[in-house]
Structures are given as C-alpha cells and as structure tokens.
C-alpha cells in the first residue's frame, strides 16, 4: 500500500478546512501535484505547499494511507465524507474529524475537537485522546446524528455525546460530559468512566452501557426511567461480546463484561420509553 505524508510546517494563523483531502482524491497524483491542491484558510484558499511538506511513497492509490504529522488542532474536517482508505493523524486533530464518513478508517493519535463523527454512516474512527462536545451527534441544523460505523474514544468525551444518534456503536473509555445519549434514536453507546448529568435525556430507543463497575461511576438515573423486570441475560452476553471485540486487545473497562451482573432501566418514558440503560456492577 502506498502512503502520502503531509507534515505541518507551522501552525496556521486561522483555521484550515481539509475537506476533500482523502486517499481517493489523491489517487494517481505525484507529490508536486498534491502540493498544488488548494484548501480553505480562513476565508481564502491557499496551496497545500504553504502548510505542509508533502512526500509520497509510491504512486497514491484510492486505498492509500494518508498520514498527517504535527499539531493539526487548527485543521478541521479531516476525513470528511471519507469513502475508503485510511487516514492517520499523528497528533491532535481539529473539529469535525470523521464527520459524514461512510467507509474506511481514521485514526487520531491524540485528541480531537468538536463534532467528531457527526452524521458518520460507516467505517471506523479511533481517537487515542479526548474528544470535544457533540461527538457522534448531528451537524448543526440536522435531525439525525451518527448513522452507522464505529467510534472509539480512549480518553474522555464532552457534552451531548451521541445526541440524536440513530445507528452504530460508540465507545468512550473515560468520562463523558452532560447529556450523554440525549435524544438517542437507536444504536449502542458504552461508557467506561463517569457520566455527567441528564443521562439519556429524551432517548427513544437504543442501549447505553455503563461499564465502570465502581459505585462512584454509576450514573444518576432520571425518574423518567424505570427498572426493567424482564431478564435479558442472552442479549447482554451478545452486547458484552461485541463491545469487547470493538474495543480491541486493549479493551480496558470493556473486558470481561459478560461475567458481570447488570441492572437495567427502561426509558425515557417522557419520549418513547423503549431505550435501555445497562449498568454493569
């Protein structure tokens, strides 16, 4: 597999929009041609050569690996609408990373900004650090959040994680902010740390798993959720097995979930009442 390497020369003075920079867009281009591609810097467009040092290992193909090196915390929309191939960010990333992607893989070897994986429909987004508010949620003004694929956050997540999420699997190894899984339509969210206020506010369906285990990490359950009386042991074994698989070899709080007892709550009764909060104890 060929590789395109983009190393940041220096931090930009304004935010940079990297939408359109995907392995398929660079297929068949030489390094000199990639340097002449334009991106938005603030309100103007500039050539990539002004921001990055470009190097190619072979001729780029549609499934090539695109490697960003350096501090990309001011570079937004990395992996926007990605439909295949692999993108690696060797450092922090900006806002909208992995947004609207439908296939492929994005790996961030650091933290990411706001709205990561929003309206994601497929593929895998892995973030080794923390992620900002509204991850796996909707784009501003939209009604549907994450629609498929897998999001893995090995650090902490901000507020409104999974807001209006409709499908897919989202894991957070650490703590999450307020309103996690708010207005959840469907899909699975798993949290390894402590959750903020208003867990599952307005959720209609879907599953939210709390894998922390310690009593101090148990969520505060709103009165619009009620204890589940029916046994769901078989379903829990399937969920636990899938979460361990998605989390990978270093599955941390998601290891051995199937052997733990669970307490389930159904709700949000003020919305539709068919979602579930699963607390592993």
What are these regions (language model features)?
Residues 48, 63-79, 83-102, 107-113, ...:
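Surface-facing alpha-helical segments and adjacent helix-coil boundary elements at the starts of domains
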């Amino acid at each position: 597999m060929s590789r395109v390497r983009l190393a940041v020369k220096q931090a930009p003075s304004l935010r940079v929009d990297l939408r359109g920079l995907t392995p398929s867009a660079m297929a068949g281009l030489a390094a000199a041609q990639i340097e002449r591609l334009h991106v938005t810097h603030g309100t103007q467009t500039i050539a990539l050569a002004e921001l990055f040092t470009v190097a190619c290992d072979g001729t780029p193909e549609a499934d090539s690996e695109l490697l960003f090196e350096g501090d990309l915390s001011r570079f937004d929309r990395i992996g926007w609408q990605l439909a295949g191939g692999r993108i690696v960010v060797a450092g922090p990333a900006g806002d909208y990373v992995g947004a609207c992607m439908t296939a492929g893989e994005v790996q961030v070897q650091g933290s990411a900004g706001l709205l990561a994986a929003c309206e994601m429909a497929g593929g895998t987004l892995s973030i080794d650090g923390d992620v900002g508010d509204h991850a796996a949620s909707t784009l501003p003004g939209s009604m549907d959040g994450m629609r498929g694929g897998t999001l893995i956050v090995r650090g902490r997540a901000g507020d409104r994680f999974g807001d209006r999420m409709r499908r897919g699997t989202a894991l957070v190894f650490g703590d999450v902010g307020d309103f996690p899984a708010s207005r959840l339509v469907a899909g699975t969210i798993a949290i390894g740390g402590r959750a903020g206020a208003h867990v599952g506010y307005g959720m209609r369906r879907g599953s939210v798993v709390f894998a922390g285990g310690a009593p101090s990490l148990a969520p505060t359950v709103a009165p619009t959720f009620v204890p589940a009386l029916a046994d769901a042991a078989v379903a829990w074994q399937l969920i636990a097995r899938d979460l361990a698989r998605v989390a990978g070899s270093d599955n941390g709080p998601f290891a051995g979930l199937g052997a733990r007892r669970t307490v389930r709550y159904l709700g949000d009764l003020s919305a539709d009442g068919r979602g579930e909060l699963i607390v592993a104890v």
